[in-house]
């Protein structure tokens, strides 16, 4: 994450050269999760892999006795997978093990020579190489050019052929959304029915602000979202 330094008011997990201990490793299997806390998030520094879950992923407890089963099935999630793929511009082939009702928005990005050679050699032994599924343009898509093979998907695509959250932000602002950057939400308030009524956030000067609204969408990540919910615990909804 070095190309995107953390800021004092919104640090992200750092492990090298020195740990900043942003994440407390309290479990038996430490996991050095890395992500960026900024507008656009970790999509500024990713390889754009956009794999869907396979069917068995949603029934880990039932099938393997570990974890928990999802509270709904793959079929309910599938339309939203495709909607996300359309928004980001995902390319790939259908042989990923995840059922699809509609094809990918784009055909796969051109295969590099090394991948082609490996696939051909493994085919002799009866092995199939499954192509990657990425939010990277194989052709012009939504005003952005196709991948030109710069091999710099991380830390950033130099021509915007690869999706990043900043694209969605630009689209939202063009539609009239007001973006408040450098704002770290630290608590959610709710009414007696449990509906969220306000969000409290600190700006970069550690000044607290309160925003009210009719609808709130919580879309941080698998760590920051539950963290915020725990910080927002109340008598009616205690932390568990």
Segments from the language model and where they lie:
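Short, solvent-exposed loop/turn segments at secondary-structure junctions
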Residues: 43, 50-52, 136-137, 186, ...
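Conserved redox-cofactor binding core of oxidoreductases
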Residues: 3-16, 21-28, 37, 47-49, ...
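FAD-binding core of FAD-dependent oxidoreductases
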Residues: 37-47, 216, 220-224
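Glycine-rich loop(s) and the adjacent beta-strand/alpha-helix scaffold that form part
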Residues: 1, 174, 183, 187-191, ...
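A generic secondary-structure signal for well-formed alpha-helical elements
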Residues: 53, 57, 81-92, 126, ...
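A short, glycine/Asx- and small/polar-enriched loop/turn
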Residues: 142-144, 191-197
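Short clusters of hydrophobic/aromatic residues that line enzyme substrate/ligand-binding pockets
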Residues: 39, 58, 196
């Amino acid at each position: 994450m070095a190309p995107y330094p953390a800021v004092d008011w919104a640090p992200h997990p750092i492990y090298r050269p020195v740990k900043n201990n942003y994440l407390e490793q309290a479990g038996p299997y430490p996991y050095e999760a890395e992500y960026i806390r900024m507008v656009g998030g970790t999509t500024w520094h990713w390889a754009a892999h956009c794999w869907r879950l396979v069917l068995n992923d949603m029934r880990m407890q039932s099938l393997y006795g570990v974890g928990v089963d999802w509270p709904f099935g793959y079929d309910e999630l599938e339309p939203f997978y495709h909607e996300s793929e359309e928004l980001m511009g995902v390319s790939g082939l259908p042989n990923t093990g995840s059922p699809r009702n509609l094809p990918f928005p784009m055909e796969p990005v051109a295969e590099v020579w090394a991948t082609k050679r490996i696939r051909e050699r493994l085919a002799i032994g009866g092995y199939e190489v499954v192509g990657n599924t990425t939010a990277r343009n194989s052709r012009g898509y939504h005003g952005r050019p196709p991948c030109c093979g710069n091999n710099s998907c991380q830390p950033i695509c130099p021509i915007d052929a690869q999706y990043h959250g900043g694209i969605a932000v630009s689209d939202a602002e063009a539609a009239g959304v007001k973006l408040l950057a450098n704002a770290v939400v630290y608590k959610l308030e709710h009414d007696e029915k449990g509906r969220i009524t306000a969000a409290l956030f600190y700006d970069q000067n550690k000044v607290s602000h309160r925003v009210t609204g009719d609808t709130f969408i919580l879309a941080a990540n698998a760590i920051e979202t539950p963290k915020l919910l725990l910080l927002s615990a109340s008598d009616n909804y205690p932390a568990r």
